[in-house]
Amino acid sequence: MRLRALATAAAIALTALPAYAHFGVLMPGSELVNRPKTPLELTLAFCHPVEQNGMNRAKPEAFDVWQNGEKTSLLNTLKETQVLKHEAWKSTFTVTRPGTYTFAFTPKPYWEPAEDKFIVHYTKVVVGAMGDEEGWEKPLGLPAEIVPLTRPFANWAGAEFRGRVLFDGKPAPEGTPIEIEFWNGSKAKLPNDYLITLQAVTGANGEFAFTAPFAGWWGFAALGDAPKMAKDGKMKDVERGAVLWTHFTKVPSQLAK
């Protein structure tokens, strides 16, 4: 019981971070697919989700889907689009059979002059199809990855979500920062800037937990470092991020009583 209490305390230690976090975005048209041969729209972007400020997203180096242990490249399906008036990408994937579909992209490094560093966010989302829920907890083997410990789709707002951060296949060190934002499509104004980006830290074994206070799409970005890269003849820092998006469903009023 004592070990469990310590792990829980470390995992849910939330603070507010008055900074404007960058997020890789991988947003499906729906978190669930209920019928076969349903086209699923996917949007790939790079932005500040709460502030709804975009940055240009060059075409990713890789874009794949995993289903039943099989990996399929979707890179050639990408078409250029715009998100928040900036370069982004879109794809349509047809779901043909029941399963858990995990989509992920590897971006080209993004140079952020304001922070004098490169940013590389390995971004993924999981979609459930036709009642199947096998395999959502399996790691993909990305250089940086959030592996869900709670099913990452079909969750109520107010339910706890848990995940484990892996860097190069190993649990992230205790205290690894995790930035948390929601997709603020309505551009709602927040009471103060501290609420723009929430922050958690990993506990033992790279684990963390978060309870979404309201429904919608929420993104988690676990941040670490990667080997330096050259920029104009100088070696620069690289922020390596593991990003996971998941949706929380509003609890109907008749169930909330």
For each feature predicted by the language model, list its residue ranges.
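Short flexible loop/turn segments that cap and initiate beta-strands
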Residues: 53-63, 170-178
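Short acidic/polar inter-strand loop motif in beta-rich domains
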Residues: 51, 108-115, 226-232
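Beta-strand-rich domain onsets/edges
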Residues: 22-41, 116-176, 182-186, 234-257
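Mid-chain, structured segments of secreted extracytoplasmic proteins
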Residues: 64-113
